[in-house]
Structure formats: structure tokens, C-alpha cells
Amino acid sequence: MTTFDFPSVLVPLVGLIFPAMAMASLFLHVQNNKTV
């Protein structure tokens, strides 16, 4: 058990950042198309 366990750090990081970026891009896409 080493302290530098990159996979155990990167997996939740990617699992959180990737959906967050997808949600942000989707939100911006909807905001740009709304034109109300």
C-alpha cells in the first residue's frame, strides 16, 4: 500500500470531472439556444 496510488486518485477524479464538463457543456449549449 503506497501513498502514491495514482489509479485510486485518478478514477474518482475523472469520474467527477468528466460528467461535470459534460453537464457544463450541455448547460451552455441550452443557454445559447434559448434566446428568450
UniProtKB/Swiss-Prot annotation:
* Keyword set, alphabetical order: Chloroplast, Membrane, Photosynthesis, Photosystem I, Plastid, Thylakoid, Transmembrane, Transmembrane helix
InterPro entries, alphabetized: PSI_PsaI, PSI_PsaI_sf
Offer one example of a GO biological process linked to this entry.
photosynthesis
Q: What's a Pfam family this protein contains?
A: PSI_8
Where in or outside the cell it occurs: the entry states: Plastid, Chloroplast thylakoid membrane
Functional note:
May help in the organization of the PsaL subunit.
Name of this protein: Photosystem I reaction center subunit VIII
Which species does this protein come from?
Daucus carota (Wild carrot)
Q: Which gene encodes it?
A: psaI
